[in-house]
């Protein structure tokens, strides 16, 4: 009986929004008919396909209005979310979203074959040896996964994120590659997913990225004798928090809507100590070149607008992903030059790591197709340390191939 009532309510909402959409479209048609415009034009550009009563401009206007109203779709997505929540639905295989048992949303990760994992791991081994042949240090960083333990997904939903990452880490450790695994660090420190990740998105929070940059700095002090760790840079007392409550609807939340998922707070730690940073994204169009303090260099305020379906709030840091970034911090205590092979977790990680050292260059192999990582290393012998920092959802051929350029569409 409960499900029947919910279904009836849902259908009434559908009828209401459908009628409203139809009225808006009819008003547009009526307004258009009042205008003395030519009434017939071939929509397809051929003489045998004509729509009497409308020219192309009229048709396009109505089409856009239908799209705007039907695809004023956050209403429909939220309505569907209310319905799905009322029905007790905990996931959608086609849209790839799932409600974990801890109340957070996540997608599932496919199983990579042992052969694929071995190939990707050996690619990392070869890259480490190549970097070391140029006198550079190398570090592979396994970033955390939102699902920390088995049994978090709804019954019957498989996920292989941690299994895939374990397969790569096992080989790297057997080959004596320098590694650090944030999954283990978080487990040892009892840092739970609920406090460290967004509920509606797959990424970690900026506060977690700040902490992670400090852990990475400690590890770099072990890898590179010239790197000095500065604990004050991870001390929360040296940051003010810019609070944005109930602002962020993450990528997974957008699939089911805020009525189902809710929205996350988006809080940004901003250094209160002095720093002067130049942040560049060199490209032919829409290049970025900003110099100033941390906030001026890294924070894109347009992505902090309260428009959850259209704005990617996570991209408030560095305006999201880029093929290549170059950072120079003249105030940094370390004079080291880092090459960071990154995924989207470094949108927030890299700015905090940049507080520790003078130069960081990042390459995102999903977007960087200019040359291979090997070629980049050959051309930049001034690099001190090469870091590959990936979370388990980044295990793809495109991101684990360093000696040639991989275009995803050709895979």
Regions found by a protein language model. Name each.
Residues 1-411:
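Extracellular glycan-modifying ectodomains
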